[in-house]
Amino acid sequence: MARKDVASMFAAALFIGAFAAVPTSVQSIGVCYGVIGNNLPSRSDVVQLYRSKGINGMRIYFADGQALSALRNSGIGLILDIGNDQLANIAASTSNAASWVQNNVRPYYPAVNIKYIAAGNEVQGGATQSILPAMRNLNAALSAAGLGAIKVSTSIRFDEVANSFPPSAGVFKNAYMTDVARLLASTGAPLLANVYPYFAYRDNPGSISLNYATFQPGTTVRDQNNGLTYTSLFDAMVDAVYAALEKAGAPAVKVVVSESGWPSAGGFAASAGNARTYNQGLINHVGGGTPKKREALETYIFAMFNENQKTGDATERSFGLFNPDKSPAYNIQF
């Protein structure tokens, strides 16, 4: 997870109202598991913690053999990332993709419930040229190995969407995303999107209310283009991604929120109270979908642990639901 330069369009038309959303429980929610720390529990202890808390989805950011082994027969659904540094190699040839699949997927699947492979996370700049060929090569390699049930996608930053307010105006700002969206449509895979209301609120606190950013009542925003009403910034952001998919000619592609969370320390509005309010609200909310898509929205909270060796803003080290000793950073119910 990197700093999100969320488009400020949301600030243009937010106003205070009095309509509250009714939370709905979600059947399946995951948590992202990062390992950039020198004091974290063993992989097997982490899987046990997931199971004890009833967390039935996980995302890992590289083909971590220890984590994959620990996940065997756990039933936990997995997003398995290919590191951005490996994308160019996999994009270069189907044989490279086949080798990656043989080394990192075949030894574990189906004992490990690998649902999606993410061809990169928040890929930027010239490296985006590798996303589409890497996805194609991975699809071919999985199919050849008899593993076609595993879907290949990529995980995008929210700022891949331009004109994000109102949500119905959302459009992908980079042309390559149209090809990615259409490939996803052809394979039945979802688009993975990292969605962080925290950064939008942090950057526009005078225009976006804290309640609107944290699933609390008191704010209503109406999309004048389609009449849909929004009571949470999260919904507005997700529906902007759906609008962009429609404009790319891929209206049937589902969105999976591959990261979302709120820091408990280290920056503006980063507190245990706000983090708990947001993440509990997220868990309670996503089972009912968004105003545009009233169906359960598969969502992965960032992150399982506070990771003390992450670089960047201080908040980067404070997104964890749990401390390294496995105690909760704050109370939350799954």
Curated annotation (Swiss-Prot):
Q: Which Pfam families match?
A: Glyco_hydro_17
Carries keyword RNA-binding? no
Please state what class of enzyme this protein is: hydrolase
Catalysed reaction equations from the record: Hydrolysis of (1->3)-beta-D-glucosidic linkages in (1->3)-beta-D-glucans
Q: Which residues form the active site?
A: 122 (proton donor), 259 (nucleophile)
Q: What is its EC number?
A: 3.2.1.39
Signal peptide as annotated in the record: 1-28
In what way does activity depend on pH? Optimum pH is 4.5 (at 37 degrees Celsius).
One GO biological process term is:
defense response to fungus
Q: Give yes or no: UniProt keyword Zinc.
A: no
Q: Name one GO molecular function term.
A: glucan endo-1,3-beta-D-glucosidase activity
Question: Which family does the entry's similarity section mention?
Answer: Belongs to the glycosyl hydrolase 17 family.
Q: What does this protein do?
A: May provide a degree of protection against microbial invasion of germinated barley grain through its ability to degrade fungal cell wall polysaccharides. Hydrolyzes laminarin in vitro.
- Protein name (Swiss-Prot/TrEMBL): Glucan endo-1,3-beta-glucosidase GII
**Organism this protein belongs to:** Hordeum vulgare (Barley)
